[in-house]
Amino acid sequence: EDCYIETPFHANFGGAHVHFGKNVYANFNLTLVDDTHIYVGDYTMFGPNVTLATAGHPVLPELREKLYQFNLPIHIGRNCWLGAGVIVLPGVSIGDNSVIGAGSIVTKDIPSNVVALGNPCRVLRPISERDREYYTKGRRFSEKQ
């Protein structure tokens, strides 16, 4: 409901296993490897070139040769923001209100209400009252806006 998805948009199964909440925004080149379910909460935003991959393959060469694959669901909470170029791997959950920095590779669960970034993605800090005053480094919200 009231979602806005920029094109191009890519999904393995045409989004058949994708469950978006209301008011989800996705910038261009959102790629959903939806071999199993992907759940996205209300008011979540995706920057350009984000990939959510539910499928993976074994490290063991003999198993890959047999075309083995595993599929694990991804859960993205309510009101999250995933920056440009983020990659979320199979089985990961991201808690409500969290921000994932651009270029991060999310290999493990991220709790609610944090800023996380990096490769592998790690929690940098909690979202705090300071974030009500500053919208980005050194830039304050103005009462006149």
Name each region found by the language model.
Residues 1-2, 7, 11:
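Membrane-anchoring hydrophobic helices of lipid-metabolizing enzymes
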Residues 81, 99, 105, 115-117:
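Short-chain dehydrogenase/reductase
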Residues 95-98, 111-113:
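Conserved catalytic segment of ABC-fold P-loop ATPases
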Residues 103-104, 109-111, 121, 127-128:
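Short glycine-rich donor-binding/catalytic loop of glycosyltransferases
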